[in-house]
């Protein structure tokens, strides 16, 4: 699959690397904080960060997901403000990353720092069918915590 992209910040692909897969087994392309200067997030702060690029998936069978980088969350409490960003196949605007400092210490993001990852996933649009009832299943209406702790 080829993913169309546009560079919106001239530093991207010049002094700051374009997104790429770190290894042959990597699922996500690293997205970078294309801020103009270091940005300090105080505990509890959220900030919408530009990535300097836009994409066009151009296939309704796929979508993009912006996911956090595990090290930033575990070591520093830096996570996505919206937990997961969903990029529809027909979206063509700049990719933005909602960054939230849920940690106890201020954290400074440097220009070009990797802040999230983009994963392309298959999706299916469904046709809704209204029914009066469902055929019985083993789980039924059991919800949160229904299967217990094992």
Swiss-Prot record:
Catalytic activity: dUTP + H2O = dUMP + diphosphate + H(+)
Enzyme Commission identifier(s): 3.6.1.23
Pathway: Pyrimidine metabolism; dUMP biosynthesis; dUMP from dCTP (dUTP route): step 2/2
Cofactor(s) in the UniProt record: Mg(2+)
Keywords in alphabetical order: Hydrolase, Magnesium, Metal-binding, Nucleotide metabolism
CDD domains the record matches: trimeric_dUTPase (cd07557)
GO MF entries: dUTP diphosphatase activity; magnesium ion binding
Source domain of life: Bacteria
A biological process term (GO) from this entry: dUMP biosynthetic process
Record: residues binding substrate: 69-71, 82, 86-88, 96
Family membership noted in the UniProt record: Belongs to the dUTPase family.
Function: This enzyme is involved in nucleotide metabolism: it produces dUMP, the immediate precursor of thymidine nucleotides and it decreases the intracellular concentration of dUTP so that uracil cannot be incorporated into DNA.
Name by which UniProt lists this protein: Deoxyuridine 5'-triphosphate nucleotidohydrolase
Source organism (scientific name): Alcanivorax borkumensis (strain ATCC 700651 / DSM 11573 / NCIMB 13689 / SK2)
